[in-house]
Amino acid sequence: MRIDIVTLFPEICRAPLNESMMKRAQEKDVVDFHIHNLRDWTTDKHHIVDDAPFGGGQGMVMKPEPIFAAVEDLSEKDQKTPNTERSSNVQRSKIENRKSKIILMSPTGRRFDQQMAAQLSQESHLIIVCGHYEGVDHRVIEHLIDMEISIGDYILTNGAIAAVVFVDAIARLLPGTLGHERSAVDDSFSSERSGLEGPQYTRPAEFRGWKVPEVLLSGNHAEIAKWRKEQAMKRTRENRPDLLGRGD
């Protein structure tokens, strides 16, 4: 999978995506990250990417021109469609014959979850546009992107932070990213789990007087599986009761 991230703050994305599992996934050619500065697609000497909103209001709005230019340059298109057609066909909705899925990180988007991550992990190419300021010109949403996505009901400094969370959740589902493929299935929120993951323990078996539950040391796999299921249900009931019944 190829993932292009278009942002005003590329360094926010580079560091976390070059560590741990994301670094190994790139080294194994599981995923290919490309991080771009939106200002590279501006045409004025000051590299302006925002302007005041029509109708007045607080803050600034991201201009459509550099966003359209960036996405059109990065989109994987059907080879039957020449680049000259792209530049001459100025007024149109969406990019024709496109193979890429275009995402806008925005607090007004659909709330991201594990099922959406699994669905998007089937794509071959994602282009992620990171919002900033008071948002983007609405023509970007109407005529360019495929999905607006929010990672939660809170406001971040910029969309680059959200983009890192977004691509990490997707890339770890790609075959070859994790050391144990079953790990992604057993995680909380996975498509095969209706709630949260249960508690985990490791050595030592006793720490400051707190002991690991005996069942985990018993070697009885059926009882261990039963205990884990019960504990997962208990944790879900206590922390996320809204998840109960989703997988039934």
Describe these PLM feature segments:
Residues 63-85, 89-128, 132, 138:
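S-adenosyl-L-methionine/SAH cofactor-binding core of RNA-modifying enzymes
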Residues 192-247:
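Long, charged alpha-helical interface segments
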Residues 42-43, 50, 54-69:
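A short aromatic-anchored loop/beta-hairpin motif
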Residues 37-48, 114-117:
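Short, hydrophobic/aliphatic alpha-helical segments
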Residues 4-6, 34-36, 103, 126-127, ...:
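Hydrophobic/aromatic beta-strand patches that form the interior of the parallel beta-sheet core
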Residues 136, 140-184, 189:
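Structured adenosyl-cofactor binding patch, chiefly the S-adenosyl-L-methionine
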Residues 2-40:
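Glycine-rich, flexible N-terminal cofactor/catalytic loop recognition
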Residues 106, 182-198:
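A short beta-strand-loop-alpha-helix capping motif that often carries His-Thr
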